[in-house]
């Protein structure tokens, strides 16, 4: 019995020593805001360094919370419970995760709640008594919000002839129907816009990837500013014949000298799918760091110019605010390795209706340019190109579009992709 008592006493002593070693004096852990700008907070999100933002740990005897402010793209503030452990004298390690039901936004001021979980955030790191912290954070689109879209999608480049011998599908496709006397115009526009739009996008865009961590990357071609004024409206039938290959199919290929640029996986844009919509959310803060100075103030200035032209800002402004909240929104259809991202008449109506009042004013501006002998050669070339496009689309002047849209029954503009 004495021997058993001694063994029990020793086990109890070892257990107490272990408990004491595991205990953390939470009062020693810095609780102040630690900023990335100061250099005392070294933070990465999906391995991309964060230059602006802060981290803060709040701890008590029961729990600890990590706050990340302006760190996770699309979110002003993210809080998560963390486990704290001693990592040596004056140093503690931590890890935690949280699920976000709020949708990311282009401007974090507009972030809104949504259900169900959209993003899952994980973090780990260390903090020292000297007020220095490292945070390694990762994001993941929830399984539900991935909706089977994760992966690389290539632009549709090959299409078989349809029943009318036209392509059965286009890389960029416009489907348009209208009532009465405008029916034929809408049908012709469907073909012309699909063809011209597809030829343009085929030479500018190659693929996009929806990554599991929420990043959107793409292969694209930089816009070439040279030769913009040399536009000549091609003949539709000539173009269609040129697209038919030896296999009898239509091929929308990029130009022979096209060099694709890869948009890096650098938290520049994020994505998720929810309730039948695919959202692509540009990270304006990251774009600004990479030299793009576009901001909300620039947008408001542009709205002022549009108002002067006659655009109905009362209709347009809510649409812009919606975009700031949710990013770029598309309906989508995914089936058998094909993905269609599209906007229909319901989605386009508010934006188009906002611009309709400006078209008569645009008539006057173009007429004044045409009668002005002092405009530059570049302006003359641009005016000629615009007139050629309008003529090909069946318009004498911009305001001819107004009654067409007012009599439109259905409208759909799509980007067609295939799984890589």
Which residues does each PLM region occupy?
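Central antiparallel beta-sheet cores of small beta-barrel/beta-sandwich binding domains
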Residues: 64-105
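A short, structured loop/turn motif at beta-sheet edges
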Residues: 60-62, 85-92, 128, 272-273, ...
């Amino acid at each position: 019995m004495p021997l058993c008592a001694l063994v029990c006493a020793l086990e109890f002593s070892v257990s107490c020593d272990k408990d004491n070693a595991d205990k953390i004096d939470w009062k020693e852990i810095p609780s102040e805001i630690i900023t990335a700008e100061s250099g005392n907070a070294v933070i990465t999100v999906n391995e991309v360094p964060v230059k602006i933002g802060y981290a803060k740990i709040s701890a008590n005897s029961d729990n600890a919370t990590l706050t990340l402010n302006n760190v996770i793209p699309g979110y002003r503030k993210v809080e998560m419970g963390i486990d704290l452990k001693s990592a040596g004298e004056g140093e503690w390690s931590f890890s935690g995760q949280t699920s976000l039901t709020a949708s990311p936004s282009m401007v974090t001021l507009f972030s809104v709640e949504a259900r169900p979980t959209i993003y899952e955030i994980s973090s780990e790191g260390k903090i020292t008594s000297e007020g220095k912290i490292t945070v390694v954070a990762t994001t993941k689109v929830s399984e539900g919000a991935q909706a089977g879209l994760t992966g690389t999608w290539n632009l549709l480049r090959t299409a078989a002839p349809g029943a009318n011998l036209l392509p059965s599908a286009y890389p960029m496709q416009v489907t348009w129907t209208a009532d009465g006397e405008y029916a034929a115009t809408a049908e012709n526009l469907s073909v012309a816009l699909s063809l011209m739009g597809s030829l343009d996008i085929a030479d500018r865009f190659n693929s996009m990837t929806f990554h599991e961590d929420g990043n959107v990357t793409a292969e694209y071609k930089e816009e070439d500013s040279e030769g913009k004024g040399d536009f000549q409206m091609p003949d539709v039938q000539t173009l269609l014949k040129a697209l038919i290959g030896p296999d009898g199919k239509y091929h929308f290929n990029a130009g022979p000298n096209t060099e694709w640029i890869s948009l890096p996986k650098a938290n520049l844009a994020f994505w998720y799918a929810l309730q039948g919509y695919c959202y692509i959310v540009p990270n304006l803060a990251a774009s600004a760091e990479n030299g793009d100075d576009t901001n909300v103030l620039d947008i408001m200035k542009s709205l002022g110019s549009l108002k002067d032209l006659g655009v109905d800002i009362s209709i347009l402004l809510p649409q812009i605010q919606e975009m700031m909240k949710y990013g770029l929104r598309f309906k989508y259809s995914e089936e058998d390795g094909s993905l269609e991202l599209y906007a229909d008449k319901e989605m386009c109506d508010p934006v188009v209706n906002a611009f309709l009042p400006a078209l008569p004013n645009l008539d006057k501006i173009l007429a004044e340019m045409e009668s002005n002998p002092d405009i530059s050669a570049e302006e003359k070339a641009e005016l000629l190109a615009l007139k050629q496009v309008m003529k090909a689309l069946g318009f004498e002047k911009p305001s001819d579009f107004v009654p067409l849209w007012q009599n439109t029954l259905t409208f759909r503009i799509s980007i067609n992709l295939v799984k890589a």
